[in-house]
Amino acid sequence: SGDGITVYFNTYVLAPYASGEQAVSLSFIEYPELIRKQYQKHSDQWAIPIAEDEMCLVDLDGDGAEEEISYSADRDEYDYADSIVIHCDGNSYDTAMFMDSDYYGGCGYSASGYLVRTQNGKTWLYLETMGEGDGKYLQIFELMKNDVRFVTADYLGIDPNQPFDPESFVLSKRFDILGTYEAYKKFHVEEDGIPKTEDLLWTIVSTYTDWKVELTSSIDMELSVREANTKRGSGQKETLPAGTHFVLLKTDGEAYAEAILDDGRICEFELEHPSEEEWEGRINGVSISDCFEY
């Protein structure tokens, strides 16, 4: 983070399982001789992970005194909780109190989060919960010395395999466009605490995962096809025969998807939204389920 390095140890390395997660934090200021200058970030922006029931100390108002931050949940025998309780500077805030603006209210089977500091000195809690069907839900709160403010929420997930830096991090979202999958975009945190992206499309297949969404057509399909590394819309219409193999690459999350062909070219799917009487969209007037082998 901008303040130092935190080392997390596997279970049983320092203590028994019952002792919980073991971690050691090394501050750049307190231990300048341990960390070379070129590896010190020295940024006013930072993000640190915070697990359920873990306590972190953060100076929320810049007065030099650190406030205690944590969150907890009253879980049933199936590990399900109706809401999350955020503990901030001795006060407790149940996410159920934000139900008017956040219907989901933080319920789920698990929770994980990050404390995020932005350039303007404000501190945010990025709280992710996982509900039915492993659906991820990201809620953002502003943490203040005497208050917690709900900012926004969306069906997004923090990629645990990628570093979380306020200037660049990865969020995922589940889609049902030509298949069911998670796709990713790179984001940064704005000064209002809300993640913003410059990416126009969500990435389905990338360096973030080896998993692929593959399709094989069951009918001849007329699609726009272009060379790799060229702009969307720059291709030509081409009839691809039944049996063509596609690997999905990107989507706009609504009615557009890109796939790579076996010869390396890119084809574009423009989807027609279903009517009120239909449950699925169409491609060139044909129901999606009739376009591919399943």
Cite the ranges covered by each PLM segment.
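Short aromatic loop motif centered on NTY/YTY
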Residues: 2-5, 105-225
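Sequence/structural signature of beta-propeller modules
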Residues: 9, 17-45, 199-219, 279-294
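Surface-exposed loop/turn elements that mediate protein-protein interactions on large endomembrane-trafficking
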Residues: 14-26, 30-40, 85-98, 139-155, ...
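Short, conserved secondary-structure segments in the cores of folded domains
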Residues: 56, 235-236
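Calcium-coordinating acidic loop motifs
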Residues: 59-61, 117-118
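Glycine-aliphatic tripeptides that mark coil-to-beta-strand junctions in extracellular
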Residues: 64-68, 122-123
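Short alpha-helix capping/helix-loop boundary micro-motifs
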Residues: 229-234
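SH3/SH3-like beta-barrel superfamily modules
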Residues: 236-294
